[in-house]
Design a protein with these regions (language model features):
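Clamp-loader machinery-focused feature within the broader ASCE/P-loop NTPase space
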Residues: 2-146
Length: 146
């Protein structure tokens, strides 16, 4: 995902480019805004920009191994956690990861409501459950041994 693919949010894109280029990325960022403003797209572009080995003109190159992995949601340092409707046998968002990746590939700028429609959530309330919180902590503790 390139920053140029995101409509608007120019100040946010400039800020993200600046903190990545100057190696001053804070330990956490909260990206928020009204529905339909491209928050997830901005986060995806930032992650790809951080990992890109050949940034060009404020954009990820799109062709290095890291960029190719990001474009298919298979980069080792990228993981998703999202609200879902708990069903029998599905305890973590990882249980929905195939559907999530397909959703993002087919609908790169769609909103949360569209994801709920994909899940066929009905009147069920999607949540991030305790098991999911434990899974986030486990994933964040991964270490590469290279």
């Amino acid at each position: 995902m390139n920053f140029s693919d995101i409509i608007g949010n120019e100040a946010a894109k400039a800020y993200i480019r600046h903190i990545v280029d100057t190696d001053t990325i804070p330990h956490a960022l909260l990206i928020h805004g009204a529905p339909g403003t491209g928050k997830l797209s901005l986060a995806r572009a930032m992650a790809q920009y951080i990992h890109c080995t050949n940034r060009q003109n404020g954009e990820p190159c799109g062709v290095c191994p890291s960029c190719k992995q990001h474009l298919t949601f298979n980069h080792a340092d990228l993981f998703f956690s999202f609200p879902y409707v708990k069903t029998q046998g599905c305890r973590l968002s990882d249980d929905y990861i195939t559907e999530w990746k397909t959703f993002l590939l087919n609908n790169p700028v769609e909103g949360f409501q569209r994801w709920l429609d994909e899940l066929d959530a009905g009147n069920s309330q999607p949540m991030i459950y305790v098991d999911e919180s434990d899974n986030i902590l486990r994933k964040m503790s991964y270490v590469s041994y290279s």
